[in-house]
Structure formats: C-alpha cells, structure tokens
C-alpha cells in the first residue's frame, strides 16, 4: 500500500492509513539516475489519481535520466505519456516555465479546459513550439491514444504534423479553440 510504503521513507508523511490502497509507483530520476521523487498513480477511480512524493527538493520533472537535452526534445504533462515519445520529459502538472532548450510542448488534448488553454497561450507567447491536436483525435492524452490502438509511430506522426510556433501557433490556436468550443 502506498501510504504505508511512503511512511517507511518519510516517517508519518501519512498520519492515517485510512483509504490506503496499492498504486503504480513511477520513479523520478535525476540525470545521474538517482531517485529524487516518485509518483503513485491510482489503478482505479481513487482520488487523487496521482500523488507525488519528493525525496529531495527538485522540480517534479520525469525522464531527466532518459532525455538528451542537447537535441530537440518533447515535454508533456504525464510520465506515462512521456514513455511513448522518444526524447521526452514530463512535468508534474502543466507548468513548463522553468524549462530551457530546444523543445516542443505537448499538452493533454483537453480544449475545453480553461487552465490548459491559459497554459497553451502562455507557452505560445513565450515562443515555444507546441502541439495542437487535430480535431479527429478524441483521446485525452498520449496514453489514451495508445490504449485506443494507435501505434507509437502514429502518435509521433500526429505530433510532428501538428507542431506549431510563432504566428502560425497563434493562428492555429485561435482556430483550435473555435473548433473545439462546442
């Protein structure tokens, strides 16, 4: 059980074990492969869906041990999503502000989510490349696309064909919001 395990590392992190249940453990490793945090993902409908525990004071970035920042890389919201994309990081949540380098941001496909729309607009205005999912993609995220039967290569092709930056990103974002406003 997740709370009990966490309490062995950080005594009394969870004073009560009520509602404790098994979770998928996702390790967050630094560039040297050392674990600095881990995330527990619920298997069912338990809430919260994700619980992230920091063992060291660092930004919650998954995949630092797997990505080559000297090359173009991708950044998405969830660790599981990042596993399906080559040279990809994941940030805890959708705060991409602290990242540096040549990267493309891949937000979840939630066009009606006001917070994600604000983050997309902020990312575009910052000058970063961004993926704006085409209308035919109905799945919420990369993991759901894979679960629906798409191959890793198909997802990568959709990402490549729907990456925008600068004025093109602003124009496409305006269209994307209108198309998905219903």
Task: For each feature predicted by the language model, list its residue ranges.
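Replication-associated primase and helicase/ATPase modules
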Residues: 1-17, 27-32, 75, 102-106, ...
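Phosphate-handling DNA/RNA-contact segment within nucleic-acid enzymes
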Residues: 2-103, 107, 115-117
């Amino acid at each position: 059980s997740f709370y009990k395990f966490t309490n062995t590392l950080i005594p009394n992190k969870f004073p009560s074990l009520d509602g404790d249940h098994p979770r998928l453990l996702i390790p967050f490793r630094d560039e040297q492969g050392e674990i600095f945090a881990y995330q527990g993902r619920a298997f069912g409908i338990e809430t919260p869906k994700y619980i992230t525990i920091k063992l060291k004071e660092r930004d919650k970035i998954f995949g630092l041990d797997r990505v080559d920042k000297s090359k173009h890389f991708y950044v998405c919201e969830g660790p599981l999503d990042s596993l399906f994309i080559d040279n990809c990081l994941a940030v805890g949540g959708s705060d991409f502000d602290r990242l540096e380098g040549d990267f493309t941001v891949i937000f979840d496909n939630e066009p009606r989510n006001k917070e994600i729309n604000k983050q997309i607009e902020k990312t575009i205005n910052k000058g970063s490349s961004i993926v704006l999912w085409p209308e035919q993609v109905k799945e919420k995220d990369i993991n759901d696309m894979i679960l629906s039967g798409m191959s890793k290569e198909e997802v990568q092709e959709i990402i490549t064909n729907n990456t925008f930056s600068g004025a093109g990103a602003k124009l496409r974002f305006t269209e994307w919001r209108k198309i998905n406003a219903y």
